[in-house]
């Protein structure tokens, strides 16, 4: 049995220890065989690493880009995006900007260099402008998953998502840019976590576990009196949950800074949509379904419904393939079940909310 990053999990692995959330509640039991849904649940609860039985590690993952349940039978929407000139240009600029961001952040932490948020925002804002629209930004991020340093790429993704999501909420341009800055710096505290703790091969003791839980506090202290208060609060509160089940303060509702409430959604969404060794990025409607299954009580309802409905609306009039192999076009969302829209297959209209065993497999 050994510890493995959540990012490296794939279906078929068997848990060697119970998986706990930050309230120390069991979310999956030892001996559970992982499925795509279970992996998403682990990610949704912000768990960074789990223990896997040694025997399970020898099971080879399915081919890259293949879902464990459904092997793609058609060229996907993601394939078209990745092969487009716009994506190739975005990818090149994204990698350059993220590398520059990494250098600047390390200087801020290691050399106590002044934090100039306006300077930090210049290039990410250019990237947003170059993508052309919120839907294009989502498409690019869903497929932009091979940057070497995941910590910094994740922060860049959350920044871009925050900007788009703030626009959906009709926030002012100044607040949209502030939300972007909150995303860029929300995880800066991870740079203060002991390397020995992060790489420890054995089980973490309670002291070490609490040390990891303190990364929001470390981030807050790094940023205190150096940046806007909302940026400080987003570093401190992005793991807080609306129902009070988060950490480190276990505050709830409106006591959580509104920028942190938005950052929490972008943070989890980016983690769930990341490609894995056994599959490409999750279909957006699958991600929406995971949020629905886990419940909305952990997030600001206005923010999460705006976020998910706008993600869904991005793909209305898009082609798709259903899990039974039929091809169709997404016609409209179901407000009460955003993950299950109405799909037109030929002359037939299929309301997925009425067919629990049927889902959108891929976009095309």
Label for each model-derived stretch:
Residues 158, 178-193, 209-305, 313-315, ...:
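Alpha-helical scaffolding flanking metal-ion-dependent phosphate/phosphodiester catalytic sites
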Residues 24-27, 149, 206, 246:
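Short, contiguous strand/loop micro-motifs
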Residues 68-210, 224-225:
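Acidic/His-rich, divalent-metal-binding segments that scaffold phosphate/diphosphate chemistry
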Residues 1-111, 115, 281-364:
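Terminal helices and disordered tails flanking the catalytic cores of nucleotide-processing hydrolases
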Residues 19, 198, 204, 242-247, ...:
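Short clusters of hydrophobic/aromatic residues that line enzyme substrate/ligand-binding pockets
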């Amino acid at each position: 049995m050994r510890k493995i990053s959540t990012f490296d999990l794939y279906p078929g692995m068997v848990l060697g220890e119970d998986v706990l959330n930050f309230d120390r509640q069991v979310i999956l039991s030892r001996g559970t065989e992982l499925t795509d849904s279970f992996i998403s649940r682990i990610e949704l609860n912000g768990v960074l690493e789990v223990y896997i039985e040694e025997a399970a590690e020898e099971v080879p993952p399915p081919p890259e880009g293949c879902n464990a349940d459904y092997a793609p039978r058609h060229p996907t929407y993601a394939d078209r995006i990745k092969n487009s000139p716009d994506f190739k240009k975005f990818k090149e600029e994204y990698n350059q900007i993220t590398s520059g961001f990494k250098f600047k952040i390390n200087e801020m932490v290691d050399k106590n260099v002044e934090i100039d948020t306006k300077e930090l925002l210049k290039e990410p804002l250019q990237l947003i402008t170059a993508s052309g629209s919120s839907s294009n930004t989502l498409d690019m991020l869903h497929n932009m998953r091979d940057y070497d340093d995941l910590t910094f790429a994740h922060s860049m993704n959350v920044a871009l998502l925050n900007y788009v999501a703030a626009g959906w909420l009709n926030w002012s341009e100044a607040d949209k840019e502030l939300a972007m800055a909150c995303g860029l710096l929300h995880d800066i505290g991870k740079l203060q976590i002991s390397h020995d703790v992060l790489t420890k091969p054995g089980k973490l003791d309670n002291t070490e576990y609490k040390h990891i839980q303190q990364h929001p506090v470390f981030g807050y202290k790094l940023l205190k009196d150096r940046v806007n208060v909302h940026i400080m609060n987003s570093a401190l509160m992005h793991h807080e949950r609306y129902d009070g089940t988060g950490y480190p303060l276990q505050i709830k509702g409106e006591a959580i800074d509104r920028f942190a409430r938005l950052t929490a959604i972008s943070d989890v969404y980016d983690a769930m949509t990341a490609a894995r060794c056994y599959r490409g990025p999750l279909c957006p409607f699958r991600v929406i379904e995971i949020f629905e299954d886990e419940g909305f009580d952990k997030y600001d309802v206005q923010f999460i419904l705006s976020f998910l409905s706008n993600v869904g609306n991005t793909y209305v009039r898009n082609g798709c393939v259903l899990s039974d192999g039929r091809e169709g076009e997404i016609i409209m969302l179901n407000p009460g079940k955003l993950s299950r829209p109405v799909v037109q297959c030929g002359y037939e209209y299929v309301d997925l909310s009425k067919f629990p065993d049927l889902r959108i497999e891929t976009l095309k």
